């Protein structure tokens, strides 16, 4: 079996929230509204939406942005949400006591939310390097030659 190595993209940061006690359908309703938008626009949208799923998603987006700003020196204004997905987590099964000694089963669903932010200001340079890696090397060699002369 041949394994393809993924080239790590240094223009992306992510945050993963696991076991969030919420239905995947309710979380996807919010995630679909913010996918592909800028970071600042997303914060405004999430603060004004009346859904309970907005708060954990807002915390995850803020965490991903903090990762990018602290670890990668990204700029807040150039961040966009490149990937946002909600996956189903494990379901906790409980019993609710009812009248006359009976009980009804209750399913408490959880979900895993993944947010990936991309810095679009660095993306152009990265794509240029992937297409023509020698072009950037030639530019750096020209500047060294100019400095010597």
Curated annotation (Swiss-Prot):
Main location: plastid
GO biological process, one term: translation
Keywords: Chloroplast, Plastid, Ribonucleoprotein, Ribosomal protein, RNA-binding, rRNA-binding
Source organism: Pelargonium hortorum
Superkingdom per UniProt: Eukaryota
Pfam family of the protein (one): Ribosomal_L22
Locations listed in the record: Plastid, Chloroplast
Function: This protein binds specifically to 23S rRNA.
InterPro entries in UniProt: Ribosomal_uL22, Ribosomal_uL22_bac/chlpt-type, Ribosomal_uL22_bac/org-type, Ribosomal_uL22_CS, Ribosomal_uL22_sf
Record flagged with keyword Ribonucleoprotein: yes
CDD domains cross-referenced by the UniProt entry: Ribosomal_L22 (cd00336)
Gene Ontology CC: chloroplast; large ribosomal subunit
Assembly and binders: Part of the 50S ribosomal subunit.
GO MF annotation: an example: structural constituent of ribosome
UniProt-recorded name of the protein: Large ribosomal subunit protein uL22c
Secretion signal, residue range per the UniProt entry: none
Stated family: Belongs to the universal ribosomal protein uL22 family.
């Amino acid at each position: 079996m041949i394994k393809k190595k993924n080239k790590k993209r240094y223009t992306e940061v992510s945050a993963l929230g696991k076991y969030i006690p919420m239905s995947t359908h309710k979380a996807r309703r919010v995630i679909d509204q913010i996918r592909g938008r800028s970071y600042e626009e997303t914060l405004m949208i999430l603060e004004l939406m009346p859904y309970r799923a907005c708060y954990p998603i807002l915390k995850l987006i803020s965490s991903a942005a903090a990762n990018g700003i602290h670890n990668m020196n990204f700029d807040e204004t150039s961040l966009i949400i490149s990937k946002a997905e909600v996956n189903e987590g494990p379901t906790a099964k409980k019993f609710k006591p009812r009248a006359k000694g009976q009980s009804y089963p209750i399913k408490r669903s959880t979900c895993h939310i993944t947010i990936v932010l991309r810095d679009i200001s660095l993306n152009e340079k990265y794509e240029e390097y992937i297409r023509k890696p020698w072009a950037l090397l030639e530019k750096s060699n020209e500047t060294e030659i100019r400095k010597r002369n």
